[in-house]
Amino acid sequence: MMQSRTHNCGELRAQHAGEHVKLVGWMENVREVGGSLAFVVLRDFYGTTQIVVETSELLAQIKGYNKESTISVEGTVRERASKNPNQPTGDIEVVPEKIELLGRCRYNSLPFEINRSREADETQRLKYRYLDLRNPAVKKNIILRCNVIAALRKAMMEHDFLEITTPILTASSPEGARDYLVPARKHPGKFYALPQAPQQFKQLLMTSGFDRYFQIAPCFRDEDARGDRSPGEFYQLDMEMAFASQEDVFAVCEDVLPPIFAKFGTYDIASQPPFRRIKYLDALEIYGSDKPDLRIDLTATNVSSLFEGSSFEVLADKTVKAVAISNCSLTRKQIDKLLTDCEVQAGAKGYWFKVDEKGDLAGGIAKFVDKEAASKLLPLEPNTLVLVAGGELATKLVGVMIKTFGPACEGHMDKERYEFCWIVDFPMYEIGDESGELEFCHNPFSMPAGGLDVLLKAERGEIDPLTITADQYDLVCNGVELSSGAGRNHDPEIMIKAFELVRLGEEDVKAKFPAMYNAFCYGAPPHAGIAPGVDRMVMLLAGEDSIREIIPFPMNKNAQDIMMGAPSEVTQKQLDELHIAVTAHEEE
């Protein structure tokens, strides 16, 4: 019996001319030239090959096959008379002696053209994802994902990390987002939860005596979709290190990530260590965001003094920030369009004025600005555009302005590179929007800077707890947050005191986090970790704006898998076995 194929559809070259070969793949296209001549494009995972049918019998045979049927072709390779330099196999063609149908496409028309599937409606693409993935332009992102994960795994092992899998069925835990719950059939009224992250397990591994842990970890959070966040399920390069600090984590990430970004990315330039470190409050003040895109050279300046007692009441006596953009050639229409985009994103209206070629202020709110006073705060060279944001959302708006106008203004963004930075010194506590009381700002298990002493001072009223910073850090690349990490609070006494400041006592901690609290009472090492998002990394490397483009089978924005029909109703028998009564149904 002959093997299923002798070559794939992407490997035949001129040196194979004269060889007898067998190819298999999808019949992508058929172009009939006459009664006994047709050109067939045969496609498999590796590429395409032109098949030249030169007999009326074989032509009649393939005319009975719909496009996207799978076939095998046995024939002889020959050099093309008219070569195609844009195709790897463009120097050759195969003249078939035998064609066999392997899998018939039963439909005369497709939901979309395979090679143009990215232009199709997203709902159609997700419904027929198995067709969408036949498009090489779509498939390449999944191949990239595989290669990046393999490289990450190899790099982590070279740094002496052990790959250890942690449970998928675990206990529900108050970690910020909503849990996906799994009813326990043998324990009526009780539920497992899918892990939002392996956070507690990886810290427990450190208390168990393991030194360096990692895994490509699946995480499950019932949260809404965004461009850089897929609903339901995502993956992260989860890591933790015992007897380690922030510096140890930084060293590993700075050693592992730049080579992978430079090798697999759309751009081949990535930050070299050490990455720039920016304090959280400084990032907000300078860039208007804790996720700055350092490829953009624009920064914010506080110009509140310019509008003290101003007749422009919208900005009068408020916090006002400005961004000066030199050598800006945008038209008024373009400026207004971009400001409208900023308003939609930030929920606040922005303003502008410009320095004309003569050096005079013009346009927008220029009449409300004193040039002499402004020139002491801002570089007002001719052709400088000044963007202005004021009020409670001034910081947020100015951050959006920088990320929106930076790419639009020539010379202010070095786009073709990956620029990493660390955001450090996050606040430990904040005032809750709903409660109006002190709450943890981010991870409650981060070690407070200053340890127990600073918590005791806050308890005694000697310092404001809002001034306490945590040993917590974010890794940001090109304005995208890749990960949060922290030096962990491994001391039960410090942990209890940290929770007491938010009105939770020792019994609350024991009840919410029993395993971790008990483990720490048996002597825990100082430890630290981080978990860069794999999906976000691949999205950046692929140059995609939507995270769904780099996931093999993504959900839509409403957390629905419309290809598989999930979520779906289940039978009453299944519900009875799980002791569940459905009290509400989704309206059709």
Q: Which stretches of residues belong to each language-model region?
A:
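Class II aminoacyl-tRNA synthetase catalytic cores and aaRS-like
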Residues: 1-588
